[in-house]
From Swiss-Prot:
Top-rank lineage group of the source organism: Bacteria
Annotated gene: rhaM
GO biological process: rhamnose catabolic process
Compartmental location: Cytoplasm
Signal sequence interval, chain numbering: none
Family: Belongs to the rhamnose mutarotase family.
Pathway as given in its UniProt record: Carbohydrate metabolism; L-rhamnose metabolism
Gene3D superfamilies: 3.30.70.100
Catalytic class of the enzyme: isomerase
InterPro entries according to UniProt: Dimeric_a/b-barrel, L-rhamnose_mutarotase, Rham/fucose_mutarotase
Assembly notes: Homodimer.
Name assigned to this protein: L-rhamnose mutarotase
Protein source organism: Pectobacterium carotovorum subsp. carotovorum (strain PC1)
Length: 104
């Protein structure tokens, strides 16, 4: 299992919208994530800095990357693009984090 962590951001006045849209996420999106090998997916919000910290365990990098090509993921990105910085393809602007410590 691969562990992935990343940082995104949310617009300062959109914290509540971001949280509401994730509780719960669309059932079809949850199904795609699970079917593509995503486990233990969490997102944490730092309200003071408008930062989102994501953590997910994936079965393979290729399966994780394939999620972006699904129709439901494309719709989700568009749905979220008004509450967070997004790339031209509507994917969230994100930065992968480098692992520095792990305790099993």
């Amino acid at each position: 299992m691969l562990r992935k962590a990343f940082v995104m951001s949310v617009f300062p006045d959109c914290h509540d919208d971001y949280q509401r849209r994730h509780n719960p996420i669309w059932p079809e999106l949850a199904e795609v994530l699970k079917n593509h090998g995503a486990h233990h997916y969490s997102i944490f919000l730092d309200k003071q800095r408008n930062l989102l910290f994501g953590y997910v365990e994936v079965e393979s990098e290729a399966r994780w990357e394939a999620i972006a090509q699904t129709e439901v993921c494309q719709r989700w990105w568009k749905y979220m693009s008004d509450v967070m910085p997004s790339n031209p393809d509507n994917s969230p602007v994100s930065e992968a984090l480098e692992p520095v410590f792990y305790l099993d």
